[in-house]
Structures are given as C-alpha cells and as structure tokens.
C-alpha cells in the first residue's frame, strides 16, 4: 500500500513549519513542536493525525511548549516493521519517543483513544503530568452485545487484505462528511478536506483498522483509579461516538476528575471550536499551578 508522502501529501499540511521527523523505537515519527513554556503533549485519536490540533495547538502554545505527533500506523509516522497498534504497544512506542526527545510533559491532552493512551502511561508511572485533559475520552469498553461484536468486526476487516483499500476507495467527500456527522461533528471545508486526504489513503485506513482490532480497554477502569493528578474531562454534549453520560462513570473512578460539558459540540469538539476547548484547559492549568493567571 502506498504510504502518505510528506513532500507530496503534506505540502500544505497544517502547522507544517513546526514539523520534523524523529527516529525512536523503530519508528520514523512525524512530530510538530511549537511555543515556549512548560511542556505539553497532545495525542490525537484513532484515524486522525497532527492536523486534528491545527486550531488548538497554537492557542495552547501561547503558554506552553506544545508537542504533537502522528500515532504509529497513522498519517506520516512510519515503521520498517509491522507495528504493535494495541494499547500496550502504543504506550511503549510513545515512551520511546518522549525519552528520545527528553520531553517530560506537565500538561497532557488526549482526544478519544489518545486519552486512553495517556491514562495508561500515567497509571504506569511513565508520565507524571500536573494536569491531564481528556477531550471526549474513550476510556470504557463497549458494553453488552457491542463489546464482542465491534472489535470482532474490526478484526475481520483488518485480516481482509482488501478492506483498507475498500475503505480508502469509498472515502469521498460525501462519505467522510457523513461519517463525521455520525459522530456529532460538522467541520469547516478545510477540516473535511484533510480527513478526506487521510481516509483516501489505504495505509492510513489500515493503521486505523488495526488499532481498532487490537484495542482492549478491560484494564482501564482500574487504571483510572491510579491517576493522581488533576483530571479535566471535556465532554461534547453532541458526541455520538462516545456517550456523554460515560463521563460520569469515568469521573467516579478517577480521584481528582471533574467534568466540563461543551454544549453544541460533538466528538471532534477541539476541531469544531478550538477556542472553546482552549479556555477551560487554560483555566485548569492555572488552577494546577502550571502557568500564571495573567
């Protein structure tokens, strides 16, 4: 499958001037770094990339040194070997990256599955942030019938060598817009174009499918209980991918968690209205003593 090429496919990539490539843990990571101040790490969700932070990262960079990257199997991060895209595999890969960069984040922000990766790293003591922010965090396993059906369906698609190509072939503008609408999100034309570009690439689709096929959150409820830092759960009230009411269960298991609901926003809240997401993050960072309140 043809990989995305940064010179060709990323010629107009958001925040391209902040991009570079770093070798760590067997991967060639596409990373972006901008701003000055306490270090902040941002992790996108399944099937996304650094572009997801195009609006929020510059706002946070007013106070923080912000680091974002493409997850293994996604967008412009590549590997010579077949990567382990399970939750433990992702956590191990990220550990190698932050070690290589000598990056010890004080603020960590994760969207959807990216929040679950951060929760695992914090619970295991690999990261020790002063504030953990989850944007529509995907922390809880599917319940009931869906618990076995959805991962099994992803595995069936992944083992079919034509599945990723079929997904990419079908990823026209209307299909991707409908997929995003199904998550309660409507993006501007630029945001939609970027997702069409990603989802039209079979290698990127294959990475997302493999990640879903290998995702196991069965330990997550116990791991949430080991997160000692202040935790802000930002919840899009219109999210149709992660049930907004799940945040109450997550907060009940996480010692220092509080919920802030974002009315009118869906699963990709930080892309829909980055300024509305940046404001509570900054307030929480001030309260946690990470930055001044001026």
Where are these regions (language model features)?
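Acidic catalytic loop of the alpha/beta-hydrolase fold
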Residues: 238-242
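Conserved HGGG/HGGXW glycine-rich cap/lid loop of the alpha/beta-hydrolase fold
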Residues: 27-76
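Alpha/beta-hydrolase fold catalytic core
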Residues: 1-40, 61-64, 92, 99-104, ...
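Catalytic histidine-centered segment of alpha/beta-hydrolase-like enzymes
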Residues: 265-278
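Conserved alpha/beta-hydrolase catalytic His-Asp/Glu region
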Residues: 144-148, 165-225
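Active-site loop/oxyanion-hole signature of alpha/beta-hydrolase fold enzymes
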Residues: 22, 32-34, 67-109, 113, ...
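Flexible "cap/lid" loop of the alpha/beta hydrolase fold
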Residues: 123, 129-161
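Short beta-strand/loop motif that positions the catalytic acidic residue
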Residues: 227, 233-235
